[in-house]
C-alpha cells in the first residue's frame, strides 16, 4: 500500500485516511497527508476508561525543517480560507503495519513512522533524517487538546501547567489528566499561552457539524542536525507516566513481532520462502492486510477482564450485534479461539431478562438493551464456535443456561427498555413499538424512528427458528427439552412459510404488512438452520429478487430502487444522513448474508444442472468480491480497512465510519472461501 508523489495530489489525498489502534479502544488516525479533516482525527485518541471515554490528547505533531536559516513547513493544516503547503514536500505514503511518511527538502530526506504501544495509551513517532550538505534544524510542535472525541473545543486560551524533568515533559490541560512527552534528542522550548486557532475540519462541515476548533500548543522541540548527518529521533506522547526508558523503535519492533506471530498462528499464510508464484505472493499480502485490519477492532475490556470488538472507527464502541456478525471473520477464521471465548463471556456478562446488552454507554459503561436481534445472533455464533473449537465443556458450563434464559424470556415476553418482545400464538416473535428501534435498522432522528420495523420482522423470526434448532441440538442429553425446542421450531417454521411469502413481489415481507424489498429476508436462507428450505421455489425466487434489486459490487442496498423514500447517496446534515442510512444506502456486511444464501443453494439444490449453475455463481461471486475489495482496501477511503457503508450509485464512494468491523470480517470470510 504505497502512494508515490504523483498519488498525493491534494484533493484526492485528503479523501484517503489511515488508522492505527492500541487494543483497548484508543487509536491514531488522519489523512495520508497528515492533515486532519475530522474532529475524530488525532495522533493519540485515548480511552480514559478503556474502551470508553475516548479523549483527544495529541491532535498533530507539526514539523518544520530549517536549512541554512531557511524554514520549510512539512505539515499540512487546513483553515477556512487556506491550506498550508507542507504536502508539496511529501514524496510518499506507505501503510502496512503502520503509516510511513517520506519528505524531501532540498537535499535533506526525512522519514516519519507513527505507531502505538499495544494495550497502552501511548503514541510514538520515529523520525529518520538523512541530512544534506548544510546544517539543519528539525522543529516539532505538539498540537494538543483534552476533550471528548465527539466534541469540539472553542477555548481561546487553555489553562496549561508544565513540569520538565530532563527530557520528560508533563503537561496538564485545564482539569485533564497529566500528559507525558519524551524525546530522544534536542531541546524543549516552553510556549506561553500559545493557541492554534480555527483548525478547519472539512468532513465535519459536510456532516453538518461545527467545523472549527482551537488547540493548545504548549511548546516546541528543536533538534540540531549536522551536515551529512544521519539521525534518528524518537518522540513519545502518553498518558502512561513511566516513559523515560521507552523508545519508538522498540514499540515498532514489538508490533511487527506481534503481527508476525499472529500470521503464523492463523496458518493462513503460505510461509514457504522460495518458489512462490506471483499469485501466491499477492494472495498472502491480501490476507495479511485483512488480518491487520481485523486485529484493529479486537479490544481488551480491562474492567471486565474480557475481550470485545469495536464496531467501527472512529466513533463507535463495541456493539454486541456487530460483534457477533464479525465473530467468525475476526476471531474464528484467524484461530483466535481464546479471545473468541472471552468475547462470548462479554456478550452474556450483563444478560438481563433474556437480553444481552447491545452495547455500553460511552460515559459510564452502563449496559444498553436496545436490541431484539443480538441475543438471537448469539446462538449462531455459539454454533460456529463449537464447529471450530469443539469446546463443548465451555458451552455447556458457561453458555447453555444463558441461552436457555433467552428462549424462555422471548417466549414469555420482555418489556425491558420498551423492547416489547414476545412469542405470539402462531409461534412467531413480535418486537418493538413505533418508536423502538431494536433491529439493526435502528436510525432515529429527534426521537423518531426513521425505519420503524415493529411487529413481526423477517430476520428476527429467521433467527428465532435458528436459535430453537440450535438449542434442540445442544439439549441432546435432555430429550424432553430437545423435543420442546423442536416443537416450537416447527410451529415457527409453519407460520413463517405461510405468512412471510409475498407472492406478488416474489420475495418475503420485511415485516408482516410491509412489502418493501429489503435485504433482511436473506436471514431466512443464510443461517445454520434456514427457516426456508433452500431447495424450495420460494427460497430461490426470493434470492433472485434480492440479487436483481439489491446487489452491487460493494454490498447490498438497504431498499430497492423505486420504493418510497429511496435514497442512494449518503450526504448532508444529521437528519439527511439518518434518513438515508437504511433507505437504499449500500452496506458491505450484507455480502456475508448473500454469500451464505448462495452457498446454501449451491449445496442443497437437488436438480444437478441447477446446482451446477449455483456452484458457478458462487465461485464467480467470491472472485468478484476478492477483486473488488483487494483494490478497495489498498486504494480508497481508510487505507488498510473497509468502510461502514457506500453510496448506491457509481463511483460507490465509501461513507460512514472509515473502518467497520463487520465489513472487514464478512469480506474476509468470503475471500477465504476454499
PLM segments and residue spans:
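Acidic, mature catalytic/reactive cores of soluble proteins
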Residues: 1-674
Amino acid at each position: 500500500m504505497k502512494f508515490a508523489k504523483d498519488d498525493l495530489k491534494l484533493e484526492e489525498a485528503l479523501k484517503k485516511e489511515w488508522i492505527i489502534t492500541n487494543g483497548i479502544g484508543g487509536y491514531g488516525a488522519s489523512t495520508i497527508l497528515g492533515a486532519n479533516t475530522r474532529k475524530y482525527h488525532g495522533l493519540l485518541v485515548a480511552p480514559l476508561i478503556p474502551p470508553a471515554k475516548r479523549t483527544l490528547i495529541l491532535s498533530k505533531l507539526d514539523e518544520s525543517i530549517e536549512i541554512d536559516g531557511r524554514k520549510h513547513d512539512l505539515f499540512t493544516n487546513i483553515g477556512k480560507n487556506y491550506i498550508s503547503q507542507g504536502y508539496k514536500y511529501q514524496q510518499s505514503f506507505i501503510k502496512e503495519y503502520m503509516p510511513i511518511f517520506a519528505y524531501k527538502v532540498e537535499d535533506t530526506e526525512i522519514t516519519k513512522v507513527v505507531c502505538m504501544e499495544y494495550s497502552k495509551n501511548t503514541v510514538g513517532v520515529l523520525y529518520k533524517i538523512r541530512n544534506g550538505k548544510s546544517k539543519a534544524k528539525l522543529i516539532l510542535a505538539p498540537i494538543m487538546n483534552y476533550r471528548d472525541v465527539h466534541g469540539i473545543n472553542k477555548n481561546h486560551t487553555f489553562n496549561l501547567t508544565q513540569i520538565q524533568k530532563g527530557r520528560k515533559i508533563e503537561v496538564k490541560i485545564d482539569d485533564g489528566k497529566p500528559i507525558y512527552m519524551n524525546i530522544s534528542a534536542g531541546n524543549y522550548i516552553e510556549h506561553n499561552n500559545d493557541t492554534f486557532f480555527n483548525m478547519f475540519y472539512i468532513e465535519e462541515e459536510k456532516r453538518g457539524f461545527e467545523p472549527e476548533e482551537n488547540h493548545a500548543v504548549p511548546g516546541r522541540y528543536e533538534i540540531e542536525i549536522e551536515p551529512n548527518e544521519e539521525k534518528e529521533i524518537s518522540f513519545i506522547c502518553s498518558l502512561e507516566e513511566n516513559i523515560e526508558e521507552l523508545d519508538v523503535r522498540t514499540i515498532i519492533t514489538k508490533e511487527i513481532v506481534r503481527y508476525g506471530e499472529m500470521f503464523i498462528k492463523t496458518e493462513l499464510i503460505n510461509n514457504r520462502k522460495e518458489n512462490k508464484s506471483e499469485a501466491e505472493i499477492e494472495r498472502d499480502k491480501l490476507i495479511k492486510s485483512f488480518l491487520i485490519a481485523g486485529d484493529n477492532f479486537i479490544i481488551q475490556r480491562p474492567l471486565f477482564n474480557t475481550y470485545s470488538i469495536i464496531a467501527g472507527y472512529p466513533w463507535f464502541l463495541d456493539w454486541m450485534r456487530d460483534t457477533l456478525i464479525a465473530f467468525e471473520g475476526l476471531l474464528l477464521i484467524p484461530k483466535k479461539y481464546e479471545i473468541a471465548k472471552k468475547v462470548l463471556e462479554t456478550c452474556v456478562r450483563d444478560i438481563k431478562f433474556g437480553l444481552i446488552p447491545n452495547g455500553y454507554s460511552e460515559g459510564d459503561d452502563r449496559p444498553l438493551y436496545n436490541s431484539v436481534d443480538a441475543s438471537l445472533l448469539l446462538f449462531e455464533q455459539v454454533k460456529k464456535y463449537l464447529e471450530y473449537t469443539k469446546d463443548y465443556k465451555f458451552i455447556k458450563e458457561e453458555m447453555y443456561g444463558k441461552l436457555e434464559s433467552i428462549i424462555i424470556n422471548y417466549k414469555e415476553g420482555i418489556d425491558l427498555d420498551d423492547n416489547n418482545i414476545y412469542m405470539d400464538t402462531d409461534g412467531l416473535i413480535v418486537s418493538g413499538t413505533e418508536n423502538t428501534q431494536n433491529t439493526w435498522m435502528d436510525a432515529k432522528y429527534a426521537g423518531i424512528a426513521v425505519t420503524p420495523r415493529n411487529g413481526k420482522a423477517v430476520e428476527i423470526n429467521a433467527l428465532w427458528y435458528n436459535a430453537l434448532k440450535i438449542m434442540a441440538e445442544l439439549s441432546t442429553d435432555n430429550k424432553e427439552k430437545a423435543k420442546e425446542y423442536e416443537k416450537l421450531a416447527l410451529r415457527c417454521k409453519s407460520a413463517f412459510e405461510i405468512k412471510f411469502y409475498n407472492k406478488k413481489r416474489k420475495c418475503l415481507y420485511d415485516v408482516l404488512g410491509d412489502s418493501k424489498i429489503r435485504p433482511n429476508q436473506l436471514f431466512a436462507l443464510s443461517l445454520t438452520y434456514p427457516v426456508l428450505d433452500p431447495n424450495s421455489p420460494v427460497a430461490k425466487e426470493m434470492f433472485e429478487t434480492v440479487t436483481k434489486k439489491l446487489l452491487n459490487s460493494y454490498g447490498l442496498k438497504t431498499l430497492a430502487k423505486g420504493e418510497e423514500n429511496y435514497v442512494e447517496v449518503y450526504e448532508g446534515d444529521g437528519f439527511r444522513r439518518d434518513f438515508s442510512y437504511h433507505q437504499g444506502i449500500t452496506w458491505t456486511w450484507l455480502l456475508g448474508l448473500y454469500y451464505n444464501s448462495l452457498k446454501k443453494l449451491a449445496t442443497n439444490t437437488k436438480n444437478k444442472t441447477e446446482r451446477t449453475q449455483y456452484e458457478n455463481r458462487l465461485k464467480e461471486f467470491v472472485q468478484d468480491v476478492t477483486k473488488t475489495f483487494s483494490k478497495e482496501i489498498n486504494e480508497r477511503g481508510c487505507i488498510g480497512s473497509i468502510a461502514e457503508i457506500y453510496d448506491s450509485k457509481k463511483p460507490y464512494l465509501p461513507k460512514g465510519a472509515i473502518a467497520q468491523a463487520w465489513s472487514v470480517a464478512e469480506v474476509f470470510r468470503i475471500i477465504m472461501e476454499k
